């Protein structure tokens, strides 16, 4: 109950900040014809972000009980809905209106709302969760639990939010390049989900197992869990790299029959292939740190990598180095992510092993 309250308040606060920044879109020198497209899409992305945080709050509840299967199925279903609706609403397929970029935003929002509804309905319908439902609705909220929840949960939520913000800023940069680049960007963004889903599932399992060994103060086993997850993650990353590299030339045709889009998507997916290892590292070790309840450095590390390194490099690559080569600017924007994601992965890796000894923790009160 306390976790959902805090998660909702934080989601609304971050969403409000993002909406408050919307007037500054005009300072990114977008084409005048793109401004009417960029603003609605930006608003939809912000709303989707708030809904996504609500889903994550429910998902963590299930993960904490080691019931990871249902959230996984719902997440996969949500991705499928998102892909299908993107195809339908961007290009007017299946009898749906042709809304272009606005349709992409609507598709993302609908899929995330559906995910929240499905997981929420399962909570109310599952008979085995009777005690949890009773505890959720019975009595008043114990305010004493809010502080430790805030200290643990806020950095994790902010870290996820900052990563989302990093990719949202990339959308603004791409919108400045042009509508053709936006179409390719949307395809690339959809393909990136392939690796993320695998790593996020592995990361959730890592957090659960590490938290178990932290509870019994067996930090050697906690390190063993992280090392095993790291090794499994490397295999997953190489599988994702091979698949993405193999489909890069034809995947755009699943979303757009325009064959001119295929070469741009193919070349832009190269940075996505490269950053799979870094993305895996940051997801696995962010979750390992969550299991240790050592999350203080998540925020400064995320600010450095997601709000400074990625946007600054993306801007420099696209609008300084490639200012006179518009055909390479989309690739340049995405080329910032292998650097930022690998950097955050290395920093979180080091932080985990630095703080994984029993002596590094304060005695329990």
What are these regions (language model features)?
Residues 22-23, 60, 87, 91, ...:
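Transmembrane alpha-helix boundary and packing residues in multipass membrane permease domains
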């Amino acid at each position: 109950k306390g976790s959902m309250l805090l998660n909702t308040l934080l989601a609304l606060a971050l969403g409000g900040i993002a909406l408050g920044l919307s007037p500054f879109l005009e300072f990114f020198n977008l084409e005048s014809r793109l401004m009417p497209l960029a603003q609605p899409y930006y608003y939809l992305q912000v709303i989707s972000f708030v809904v996504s945080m609500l889903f994550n709050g429910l998902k963590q509840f299930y993960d904490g009980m080691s019931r990871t299967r249902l959230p996984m199925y719902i997440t996969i279903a949500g991705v499928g809905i998102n892909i299908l609706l993107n195809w339908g609403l961007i290009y007017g397929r299946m009898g749906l209106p042709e809304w272009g970029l606005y349709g992409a935003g609507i598709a993302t929002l609908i899929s995330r709302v559906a995910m929240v509804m499905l997981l929420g309905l399962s909570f109310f319908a599952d008979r085995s969760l009777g005690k949890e439902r009773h505890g959720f609705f019975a009595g008043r909220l114990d305010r004493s639990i809010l502080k430790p929840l805030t200290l643990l949960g806020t950095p994790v939520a902010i870290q996820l939010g900052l990563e989302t913000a990093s990719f949202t800023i990339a959308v603004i940069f791409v919108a400045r390049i042009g509508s053709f680049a936006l179409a390719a960007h949307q395809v690339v963004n959809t393909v990136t989900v392939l690796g993320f889903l695998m790593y996020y599932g592995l990361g959730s399992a890592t957090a659960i197992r590490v938290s178990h060994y932290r509870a019994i103060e067996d930090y050697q086993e906690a390190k063993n869990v992280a090392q095993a997850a790291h090794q499994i993650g490397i295999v997953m990353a190489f599988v994702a790299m091979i698949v993405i590299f193999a489909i890069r030339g034809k995947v755009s045709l699943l979303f757009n029959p325009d064959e001119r889009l295929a070469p741009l998507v193919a070349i832009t997916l190269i940075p996505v292939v490269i950053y799979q290892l870094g993305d895996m590292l940051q997801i696995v070790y962010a979750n390992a740190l969550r299991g240790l309840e050592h999350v203080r450095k998540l925020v400064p590390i995320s600010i450095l990598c997601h709000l400074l390194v990625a946007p600054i490099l993306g801007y420099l690559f696209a609008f300084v180095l490639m200012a006179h080569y518009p055909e390479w600017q989309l690739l340049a924007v995405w080329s910032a992510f292998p650097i930022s994601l690998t950097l955050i992965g290395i920093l979180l890796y080091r932080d985990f092993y630095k703080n994984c000894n029993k002596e590094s923790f304060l005695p329990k009160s």
